[in-house]
């Protein structure tokens, strides 16, 4: 949902329907083990209170499908994923309560929706100032494994490794190259950077002419980190006729 929200915003901006400063949007996932909460934050299209009523409170109403229909002449290649309007509700499989705090890209107040999985919910004015949506899962006592960073990291990599929007999960230390005038025995410096768990631009999204042999080897190692030998060969086809497809092996 966070990916779709960001892709929608990018598409609206790209076709000039609205004047939007998209920037470099990132999806952030945060674990609050002490508070027993999981946060998913995006900088996408956001929702008004009316849109939350429409897209969240109506089961099986797909906002993605509606968007694709509205912009059917230009959005077919936008990469939007959702289709059935049901994915959000899986949150209640692990959460005893879910909150949505959202501010639309439109000039309207933010909204704050809360539900415990029953037919009852609250929808109030929010205090969010920045565009986008934050989902807060209050993790149930029977699903404590979803408060473990290793578990969340594993799931993010497994299901989002090649999502087209960068996904931040904490930070990491990055080793900087030694300076040219470094002396023997000098240790390289490190800096703290965002830990981006996915590759938003994998090899198959690029043209073969723009890739070198080392790019394919790097992609192979990314797919098979425990395989220490280089691939024997690679085949990369981009075919467009009545049906277009990309093939990389």
Question: PLM features: residue spans?
Answer:
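GHKL/Bergerat-fold ATPase module in large chromosome/replication-associated machines
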Residues: 80, 98-120, 140-144, 150-249
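GHKL (Bergerat-fold) ATPase N-terminal catalytic module, capturing the glycine-rich phosphate-binding loop
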Residues: 2-141, 145-146, 154, 161
């Amino acid at each position: 949902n966070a990916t779709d929200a960001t892709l929608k915003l990018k598409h609206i901006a790209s076709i000039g329907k609205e004047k939007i400063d998209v920037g470099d949007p990132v999806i952030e996932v945060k674990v609050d083990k002490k508070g027993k909460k999981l946060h998913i934050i995006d900088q996408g299209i956001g929702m008004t209170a009316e849109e939350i009523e429409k897209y969240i409170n109506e089961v099986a109403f797909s906002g993605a499908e509606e968007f694709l229909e509205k912009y059917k002449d230009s959005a077919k290649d936008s990469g939007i994923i959702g289709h059935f309007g049901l994915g959000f509700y899986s949150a209640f499989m692990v959460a005893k309560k879910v909150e949505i705090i959202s501010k639309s890209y439109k000039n309207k107040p933010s909204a704050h929706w809360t539900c415990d999985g029953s037919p009852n919910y609250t929808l109030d004015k929010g205090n969010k100032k920045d565009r986008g949506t934050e989902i807060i899962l209050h993790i149930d006592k029977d699903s404590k494994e979803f408060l473990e960073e290793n578990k969340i990291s594993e799931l993010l990599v497994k299901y989002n490794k090649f999502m087209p929007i960068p996904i931040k999960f904490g930070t990491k230390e990055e080793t900087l190259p030694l300076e040219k005038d470094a002396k023997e025995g000098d240790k390289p410096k490190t800096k703290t950077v965002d830990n981006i768990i996915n590759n938003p631009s994998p090899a198959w999204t690029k043209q073969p002419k723009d890739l070198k042999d080392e790019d394919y080897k790097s992609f192979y190692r990314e797919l098979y980190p425990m395989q220490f030998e280089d691939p024997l060969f690679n085949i990369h086809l981009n075919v467009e006729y009545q049906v277009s497809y990309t093939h990389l092996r």
